[in-house]
């Protein structure tokens, strides 16, 4: 495969941008315009995988000679696998989510799609990460939400910040999966496209 230098992150997420920056690559950001609501999916894996693929495909269709990276994440409780946990958007919803998930285990299904249409390269997959919340008091929840305001975060926490203090344990092979962009897997596929890392 010839050397491909144009990389596009198909995302408007500041967290995914910060993760991508860790790789030290030159890339651009283009926000895809897709419908992110469930389309009959009954499992978080199916929804996250479809959204990651569609985000990358919408941008790839416009830039077929570029490597396009799409990612999406869906959270769900282990005991309620068909009930997706979205972004809270308000302080009240964030506090309610944390109260409901206190002492529970959440799984994060993170979809990743890497596409280079000109060469026919396309890999779309799911990575998982689990967190077990401590039993949280109402005062802890209120202090956390007031301090960090995780209103755009599925599950109502930022693990890269103070949110780490809410957990009893974490389980997964790549913590960046929990943050929304599995870098270990992404690097594997970028190397297949002759992107030098490191």
From Swiss-Prot:
GO terms for cellular component: cytoplasm. One of its GO terms (molecular function) is nucleoside triphosphate diphosphatase activity. It comes from the Bacteria. Its cofactor is a divalent metal cation. GO terms for biological process: nucleotide metabolic process. The active site is at residue 72. It catalyses: a ribonucleoside 5'-triphosphate + H2O = a ribonucleoside 5'-phosphate + diphosphate + H(+); a 2'-deoxyribonucleoside 5'-triphosphate + H2O = a 2'-deoxyribonucleoside 5'-phosphate + diphosphate + H(+). InterPro entries: ITPase-like_fam, Maf-like. This is Nucleoside triphosphate pyrophosphatase. The keyword Cytoplasm applies. Its EC number is 3.6.1.9. Transmembrane segments: none annotated. It is found in: Cytoplasm. Belongs to the Maf family. Its main location: cytoplasm. NCBIfam families: maf (TIGR00172). Pfam families: Maf. Keywords: Cytoplasm, Hydrolase, Nucleotide metabolism. Nucleoside triphosphate pyrophosphatase. May have a dual role in cell division arrest and in preventing the incorporation of modified nucleotides into cellular nucleic acids.
